[in-house]
From Swiss-Prot:
Its main location: cytoplasm. It is found in: Cytoplasm. It comes from Bordetella pertussis (strain Tohama I / ATCC BAA-589 / NCTC 13251). The gene is clpB. Residues 6-71 are annotated as: Repeat 1. Residues 390-524 form a coiled coil. This is Chaperone protein ClpB.
């Protein structure tokens, strides 16, 4: 017989048999080796075929092992040959293939030949219950009336079980999540499926709106007999395109597999509905030069109604791939799946609540569900409901479960800090100077304090963890019982159903109630101590997840933050002197937004700061960023003098398609995408090209901006500050006049420079006063304090006398240039002389650097601290 006429599976089995014989030092390959190889390969299908023929497969393997041990062994001879008995069986296999009209010899015919074999392999199968007629019937059933005409003839059998996932079976087992709502879409899908031709719906919607869930809902309705008569008993099979493509090395293999799937579907007489997720991947799948792709192979079956198909894809991909192929598009009927509103999302989350509680072993409260829907809708703008809301619930549950299973976050932070200090202690121990010794004492003291705190927390944690036991296992048992009850109800076995419903289920629910109350009592008994383990997901936990994901502080304000907001003016006045109106207006805007009273569709605040140079416009913006985020890093500063040309607008929002830099994104839009909660400073705004203001219109009004790539960037959580020197000559000339009078004059000047629609969208135009002599002294004190902080890092202290302070303020005061000359005065009169004295060794660690004004000059006299 010709070995090249064996199927790939049979060739593989013979090669495995040869390896098995060589490993066991058998000189000849016998039928029992081939039988062992066939049963050892899960992809061969031999085991399932024998089981279908009534053979007790579990009795075959031990008998094969025993027969292999009884074969003669030859040491040192690697030349393994085909035995006479195997040759005889292969000849009979060849004759059987010829009788059946097969071009290639398949492995199941080898099993058929073994039925008449007098050797060990035939005896083992007959003892396990093999009958030739039963095996022939099983082979005919598997082949489905087809001959083996190719080397891959065996591989493409039972293609549906290999390349699809049965969603109706998963629904029967209770493995699918419940589908809430979407009744109109499911009804429309059923309606299309009942058509005579072109009965193929395609679900089109944005990612995460629930397209796959609609198909799962259909599968659940079929299982529960909640569908029209024509759909009852049908199966919904999800096509696994990755499995179809994987391992198809040569041209034609993928097409053979897909053809086998289509053939089995045609033979099932419409009993199967195929679901193709990401339908656009079929258009072009397996495409090679001169070959058909999967989409073209599906067209005839779709048009004739042989293939019941449900597709799912996004709007963009449908337009890009499916609409281009008009012949494929006309075979599908569109079902548009929109994004559910917040109320519908809350209903969906309530339906999924029990599943997520069971998975994470925590309790999800109703306020958490409402918060997940509302906060995700407001703050996560680049994704869609209900997916983004489900993600919040899932992540909050995972976070609390992680705290229960591992160390609580507060203990973990303490542990890491202790390790860090221990490493630092070992490094400092090697040094002998005074500074290192002092640092070592500080480290030892802090370590002792942290270790005590850690030990206290550890005691509380162990006690709480001991209390939180048992509820998870009981909940899982209740879930299993409910799934079993649903299956019994479908089968009509009401006696067993009643036994579970009125016996086992109430008992489990009573146990769960007792375990919950014990857990609550454990948490309440130590009310004086902090509770480490949380077992509930509440609105606060959802807000924490949103805050971490977006950087936006949406969590409920703690008392400390409330007090901080009420004293906001005091904080800003520490850095900005003499601008009471500006500080008050900015503080009011921030308080409105944090209290939840501001318009949620606009930025927190948009201000135009006007005034002469050096009066604190930019400094107030820096102070605001420092107040909100404890860091000036969250200030996005854009110098508008860089945008003087018309084409420079593209730098703000990104270049349009076809231009260089399209992939890079815009300077402003990318910065806000990364830090959605920030202060945006547009410095010297009057120097920008007028077209730049057209871009800012939608930012100021709607809190959104579309970048060059078509993505919407959310500005609703930003504070926008624009600074300008316009009208500064009026402000200086009208010094001392009422604020409203000055503002009126400056407003007239603004109207000549900016368009009305731009000015109309700004929340407040803030006029900064020119600085006076008493303001300069306060600013000098702030500047000298910063210099003192820099000296403290070198273990020196700055001491400036009142006379020196007054002289610095006098020499640094210039009504035209504001506070900037003061900085230069401090540099020249204080910093330069002190720098020389430090380098000369006059001042060193633990010294006081005194600054005094005597006899018309600054004096620096060294004294020990």
């Amino acid at each position: 017989m010709r070995f090249d006429k064996l199927t790939t599976k049979f060739q593989q089995a013979l090669a495995d048999a040869q390896s098995l014989a060589a490993r066991n030092d058998h000189p000849y390959i016998e039928p029992v080796h081939v039988l062992a190889a066939l049963l050892g390969d899960p992809d061969s299908g031999a085991a399932s075929l024998l089981a279908r023929a009534g053979v007790a497969v579990n009795r075959v393997q031990p008998a094969i092992d025993s027969a292999l041990k009884g074969l003669p062994q030859v040491q040192g001879d690697d030349n393994v040959q085909v035995g006479r008995e195997l040759q005889s069986v292969l000849v009979r296999t060849d004759k059987e293939a010829a009788r059946r009209g097969d071009t290639y010899i398949a492995s199941e015919l080898f099993l058929l030949a073994l039925a008449d074999d007098k050797g060990d392999a035939g005896r083992i199968l007959r003892e396990a219950g093999l009958q030739k007629k039963a095996l022939e019937a099983a082979i005919d059933a598997v082949r489905g009336g087809e001959n083996v005409s190719g080397a891959e003839g065996e591989s493409n059998r039972e293609a549906l079980s290999k390349y699809t996932l049965d969603l109706t079976e998963r629904a029967r087992q209770g493995k699918l999540d419940p589908v809430i709502g979407r009744d109109d879409e499911i009804r429309r899908t059923i309606q299309i499926l009942q058509r005579r031709t072109k009965n193929n719906p395609v679900l089109i919607g944005e990612p995460g709106v629930g397209k796959t869930a609609i198909v799962e809902g259909l599968a659940q309705r079929i299982v529960n007999d909640e569908v029209p008569e024509t759909l009852r008993g049908k199966r919904v099979l999800s096509l696994d395109l990755a499995a179809l493509l994987a391992g198809a090395k040569f041209r034609g293999e993928f097409e053979e597999r897909l053809k086998a799937v289509l053939k089995e579907l045609a033979q099932d007489d419409g009993q199967n509905i195929v679901f193709i997720d990401e339908l656009h991947t079929m258009a072009g799948a397996g495409k090679a030069e001169g070959a058909m792709d999967a989409g073209n192979m599906l067209k005839p079956a779709l048009a004739r109604g042989e293939l019941h198909c449900i597709g799912a894809t996004t709007l963009d991909e449908y337009r890009k791939y499916i609409e281009k192929d008009a012949a494929l598009e006309r075979r599908f009927q569109k079902v548009l799946v929109g994004e559910p509103d917040v109320e519908s999302t809350i209903a969906i989350l309530r339906g999924l609540q029990e599943r997520y509680e069971l998975h994470h072993g925590v309790e999800i409260t109703d306020p958490a569900i409402v918060a997940a829907a509302e906060l995700s809708h407001r703050y996560i703008t680049d994704r869609f409901l209900p997916d983004k809301a489900i993600d919040l619930i899932d992540e909050a549950g995972a976070r609390i479960r992680m705290e229960i299973d591992s160390k609580p976050e507060v203990m973990d932070r303490l542990d890491r800090r202790i390790i860090q200090l221990k490493i630092e202690r070992e490094a400092v121990k090697k040094e002998t100077d005074d500074a290192s010794m002092r640092r070592l004492a500080v480290i030892e003291e802090e370590l002792e304090k942290l270790q005590r705190e850690y030990n206290d927390y550890e005691e509380i944690w162990k006690a709480e963890k001991a209390a939180v036991q048992g509820t998870q296992a009981i909940k899982e048992e209740i879930d299993r019982v409910r799934a079993e009850m649903a299956e019994l109800q479908r089968k009509g076995q009401f006696d067993k159903l009643a036994e579970l419903q009125y016996g086992k289920l109430p008992e489990l629910e009573a146990r769960l109630k007792a375990a919950d109350s014990a857990e609550r009592e454990a948490g309440e008994s130590d009310s004086g101590k902090p509770r480490l383990l949380r077992t509930q997901v509440g609105a606060e936990e959802i807000a924490e997840v949103v805050s971490r994901a977006t950087g936006i502080p949406v969590a409920k304000m703690m008392q400390g933050e409330r007090d901080k907001l009420l004293r906001m003016e005091d904080f800003l006045h520490k850095r900005v002197v003499g601008q009471d109106e500006a500080v008050r207006l900015v503080s009011d805007a921030i308080r409105r937004s944090r209290a939840g009273l501001a318009d949620p569709s606009r930025p927190y605040g948009s201000f135009l700061f006007l005034g002469p140079t050096g009066v604190g416009k930019t400094e107030l913006t820096r102070a605001l960023a420092d107040f909100l985020f404890d860091s000036e890093e969250h200030m996005i500063r854009i110098d508008m003098s860089e945008f003087m040309e018309k084409h420079s607008v593209a730098r703000l929002i990104g270049a349009p398609p076809g231009y260089v830099g399209y992939e890079e994104g815009g300077y402003l839009t990318e910065a806000v995408r990364r830090k959605p909660y920030s202060v945006i400073l547009l410095d010297e705004v009057e120097k920008a090209h007028p077209d730049v203001f057209n871009v800012l219109l939608q930012v100021l009004d709607d809190g959104r901006l579309t970048d060059g790539q078509g993505r919407t960037v959310d500005f609703r959580n930003t504070v926008i500050v624009m600074t300008s020197n316009l009208g500064s000559q009026h402000i200086q000339s009208m010094a001392g006049k009422p604020y409203e009078v000055i503002k009126e004059v400056v407003w007239d000047e603004l109207k000549h420079t900016f368009r009305p629609e731009f000015l109309n969208r700004i929340d407040e135009v803030v006029v900064f006063h020119g600085l006076e002599a008493q303001h300069i002294e306060s600013i000098a004190r702030i500047q000298l304090k910063r210099l003192g902080e820099r000296l403290e890092k070198q273990e020196m202290r700055l001491d400036v006398s009142d006379a020196a302070l007054a002289e610095i303020a006098r020499s640094g005061f210039d009504p035209v240039f504001g506070a900037r000359p003061l900085k230069r005065a401090i540099q020249q009169q204080i910093e330069n002389p002190v720098a020389k004295l430090i380098l000369e060794g006059v001042f060193g660690p633990r010294d006081v650097v005194p600054v005094d004004w005597q006899d018309g000059k600054f004096v620096f006299t060294r004294t020990l601290q």
